[in-house]
Amino acid sequence: MSLELCNSTRQAIPNKRLLQAIRMVVQGEGYEIATITGVYCGNRMSQRINRDYLNHDYPTDTITFCYSEGKAIEGEFYISLDVIRCNARHFNVTFEEELLRVTIHSALHLTGMNDYLPEERVAMQAKEDYYLQLLKTQKSISPQKSTDNAIFSCNS
């Protein structure tokens, strides 16, 4: 089992909280981690991936690729910290709260949830709210021991 977070920017991110959020969602939805890579990047990388894979020529908050079909998740996601910063101001929340919400959103995509249709978006937002609140209540609790390999890396 492998869970790797890569921050390719100079913006500090709460690595341990992000790992906790991903694990919480994956386990809470009844899945396990095989290999998950999360890349926290800037707008240039986000726009390039969005253009190359989805034919959308603009940066976006998150792009998720799920390669698994069973209960053991293999996948990766890319989150633009520039978009997160902008959205945090727009929604009047902290950078960290928006980052956690979008990381939870990405993890939900890895478990198979979609948000294409209006009713799917409502269900996705409800799950985001649930896990974000759960994460807030566990803030003072030390993270559980995990058997997966958690790696933090940075490619500047």
From Swiss-Prot:
InterPro entries: MetalPrtase_cat_dom_sf_prd, YbeY. Disulfide bonds: none annotated. One of its GO terms (cellular component) is cytoplasm. It comes from Chlorobium chlorochromatii (strain CaD3). It comes from the Bacteria. Its EC number is 3.1.-.-. Keywords: Cytoplasm, Endonuclease, Hydrolase, Metal-binding, Nuclease, Ribosome biogenesis, rRNA processing, Zinc. Binds 1 zinc ion. The gene is ybeY. GO terms for molecular function: metalloendopeptidase activity; RNA endonuclease activity; zinc ion binding. Zn(2+) binds at residues 105, 109, 115. This is Endoribonuclease YbeY.
